[in-house]
Protein backbone atom coordinates (compact mmCIF):
# COMPACT_ATOMS: atom_id res chain seq x y z
CA UNK A 1 0.00 0.00 0.00
CA UNK A 2 2.62 2.55 1.10
CA UNK A 3 4.74 1.50 -1.88
CA UNK A 4 2.28 3.34 -4.13
CA UNK A 5 3.29 6.67 -2.59
CA UNK A 6 5.77 8.92 -4.38
CA UNK A 7 9.05 9.84 -2.69
CA UNK A 8 7.72 13.39 -2.44
CA UNK A 9 4.56 12.22 -0.65
CA UNK A 10 6.59 10.09 1.75
CA UNK A 11 8.87 13.05 2.49
CA UNK A 12 5.82 15.26 3.13
CA UNK A 13 4.29 12.67 5.46
CA UNK A 14 7.61 12.25 7.28
CA UNK A 15 7.83 15.99 7.83
CA UNK A 16 4.26 16.17 9.14
CA UNK A 17 4.83 13.09 11.29
CA UNK A 18 7.95 14.54 12.89
CA UNK A 19 6.17 17.85 13.61
CA UNK A 20 3.93 15.98 16.03
CA UNK A 21 6.45 13.45 17.31
CA UNK A 22 7.49 15.97 19.97
CA UNK A 23 9.98 13.79 21.84
CA UNK A 24 11.43 12.33 18.65
CA UNK A 25 10.85 8.74 19.75
CA UNK A 26 9.36 7.72 16.40
CA UNK A 27 5.75 7.47 17.57
CA UNK A 28 2.77 9.81 17.75
CA UNK A 29 -0.19 9.51 20.07
CA UNK A 30 -3.60 8.82 18.61
CA UNK A 31 -5.04 12.18 19.64
CA UNK A 32 -2.33 13.91 17.59
CA UNK A 33 -3.31 11.83 14.58
CA UNK A 34 -6.25 14.01 13.56
CA UNK A 35 -4.10 17.12 13.69
CA UNK A 36 -1.41 15.50 11.55
CA UNK A 37 -3.89 14.38 8.91
CA UNK A 38 -5.58 17.77 8.76
CA UNK A 39 -2.19 19.41 8.28
CA UNK A 40 -1.88 17.26 5.15
CA UNK A 41 -5.21 18.36 3.76
CA UNK A 42 -7.12 15.27 4.88
CA UNK A 43 -10.30 15.79 6.86
CA UNK A 44 -11.20 12.63 8.80
CA UNK A 45 -14.27 12.40 11.05
CA UNK A 46 -13.91 11.19 14.66
CA UNK A 47 -15.35 7.81 13.63
CA UNK A 48 -12.92 7.51 10.71
CA UNK A 49 -10.02 8.41 13.01
CA UNK A 50 -11.04 5.77 15.52
CA UNK A 51 -11.36 3.16 12.76
CA UNK A 52 -7.96 4.06 11.30
CA UNK A 53 -6.33 3.97 14.71
CA UNK A 54 -7.85 0.57 15.47
CA UNK A 55 -6.66 -0.75 12.11
CA UNK A 56 -3.08 0.48 12.50
CA UNK A 57 -2.33 0.38 16.21
CA UNK A 58 -1.51 -3.32 16.18
CA UNK A 59 -0.29 -3.56 19.78
CA UNK A 60 -3.07 -1.31 21.10
CA UNK A 61 -0.65 0.93 22.98
CA UNK A 62 -2.23 4.13 21.70
CA UNK A 63 0.73 5.25 19.62
CA UNK A 64 1.48 4.96 15.92
CA UNK A 65 4.92 4.60 14.37
CA UNK A 66 5.89 5.99 10.97
CA UNK A 67 5.44 2.79 8.90
CA UNK A 68 1.95 2.38 10.38
CA UNK A 69 1.26 6.04 9.64
CA UNK A 70 2.37 5.69 6.00
CA UNK A 71 0.12 2.68 5.47
CA UNK A 72 -2.80 4.58 6.92
CA UNK A 73 -2.21 7.70 4.81
CA UNK A 74 -1.89 5.62 1.64
CA UNK A 75 -5.21 3.97 2.50
CA UNK A 76 -6.83 7.33 3.23
CA UNK A 77 -5.57 8.87 -0.02
CA UNK A 78 -7.09 6.03 -2.03
CA UNK A 79 -10.54 7.09 -0.83
CA UNK A 80 -10.52 10.44 -2.57
CA UNK A 81 -11.99 13.32 -0.63
CA UNK A 82 -15.70 13.86 -0.95
CA UNK A 83 -17.08 17.18 -2.16
CA UNK A 84 -18.21 17.95 1.39
CA UNK A 85 -14.78 17.22 2.91
CA UNK A 86 -13.13 19.54 0.38
CA UNK A 87 -15.72 22.27 1.01
CA UNK A 88 -15.13 21.91 4.76
CA UNK A 89 -11.36 22.20 4.32
CA UNK A 90 -11.86 25.30 2.15
CA UNK A 91 -13.95 26.91 4.91
CA UNK A 92 -11.14 26.27 7.41
CA UNK A 93 -8.73 28.29 5.27
CA UNK A 94 -11.24 30.97 4.16
CA UNK A 95 -11.27 32.74 7.52
CA UNK A 96 -13.36 35.75 6.51
CA UNK A 97 -15.79 33.68 4.45
CA UNK A 98 -15.41 35.78 1.30
CA UNK A 99 -14.95 32.77 -0.98
CA UNK A 100 -11.21 33.30 -1.42
CA UNK A 101 -8.10 32.11 0.43
CA UNK A 102 -5.57 34.93 0.70
CA UNK A 103 -1.87 34.48 1.43
CA UNK A 104 -2.53 35.88 4.93
CA UNK A 105 -5.27 33.32 5.61
CA UNK A 106 -3.08 30.49 4.34
CA UNK A 107 -0.17 31.66 6.50
CA UNK A 108 -2.46 31.88 9.56
CA UNK A 109 -3.80 28.33 9.20
CA UNK A 110 -0.39 26.81 8.39
CA UNK A 111 1.15 28.56 11.42
CA UNK A 112 -1.62 27.17 13.64
CA UNK A 113 -0.75 23.71 12.34
CA UNK A 114 2.84 24.23 13.46
CA UNK A 115 4.21 24.87 9.97
CA UNK A 116 6.49 27.88 10.13
CA UNK A 117 6.55 29.05 6.53
CA UNK A 118 8.39 32.01 5.09
CA UNK A 119 6.40 34.64 3.19
CA UNK A 120 8.05 33.31 0.03
CA UNK A 121 6.83 29.76 0.72
CA UNK A 122 3.27 30.94 1.37
CA UNK A 123 3.28 33.11 -1.76
CA UNK A 124 4.59 30.15 -3.77
CA UNK A 125 1.77 27.91 -2.47
CA UNK A 126 -0.80 30.52 -3.48
CA UNK A 127 0.86 30.99 -6.90
CA UNK A 128 0.79 27.24 -7.57
CA UNK A 129 -2.93 27.00 -6.84
CA UNK A 130 -3.94 30.39 -8.29
CA UNK A 131 -5.07 29.47 -11.81
CA UNK A 132 -6.64 32.82 -12.79
CA UNK A 133 -3.73 34.85 -11.39
CA UNK A 134 -5.73 37.12 -9.07
CA UNK A 135 -3.39 36.46 -6.13
CA UNK A 136 -5.93 34.43 -4.16
CA UNK A 137 -7.30 30.89 -4.27
CA UNK A 138 -11.02 30.54 -5.02
CA UNK A 139 -13.07 27.41 -4.37
CA UNK A 140 -12.66 25.99 -7.90
CA UNK A 141 -8.88 26.44 -7.71
CA UNK A 142 -8.87 24.83 -4.26
CA UNK A 143 -10.81 21.80 -5.56
CA UNK A 144 -8.37 21.51 -8.46
CA UNK A 145 -5.42 21.62 -6.06
CA UNK A 146 -6.96 19.07 -3.66
CA UNK A 147 -7.98 16.57 -6.36
CA UNK A 148 -4.97 16.72 -8.70
CA UNK A 149 -2.68 13.80 -7.96
Swiss-Prot record:
The keyword Oxidoreductase does not apply. Pfam families: EF-hand_7. Ca(2+) 2 binds at residues 57, 59, 61, 63, 68. GO terms for cellular component: myosin II complex. The keyword Metal-binding applies. Gene3D superfamilies: EF-hand. Ca(2+) 1 binds at residues 21, 23, 25, 27, 32. Residues 8-43, 44-79, 81-116, 117-149 form the EF-hand domain. It comes from the Eukaryota. Ca(2+) 3 binds at residues 94, 96, 98, 105. Keywords: Acetylation, Calcium, Metal-binding, Methylation, Repeat. The modification N-acetylalanine is found at residue 2. GO terms for molecular function: calcium ion binding. Ca(2+) 4 binds at residues 130, 132, 134, 136, 141. CDD domains: EFh. Belongs to the calmodulin family. This protein has four functional calcium-binding sites. This is Calmodulin-2. It comes from Branchiostoma lanceolatum (Common lancelet).
Amino acid sequence: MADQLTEEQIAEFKEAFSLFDKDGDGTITTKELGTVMRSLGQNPTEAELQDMINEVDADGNGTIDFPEFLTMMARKMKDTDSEEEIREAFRVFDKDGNGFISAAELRHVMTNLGEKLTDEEVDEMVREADIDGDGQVNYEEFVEMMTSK
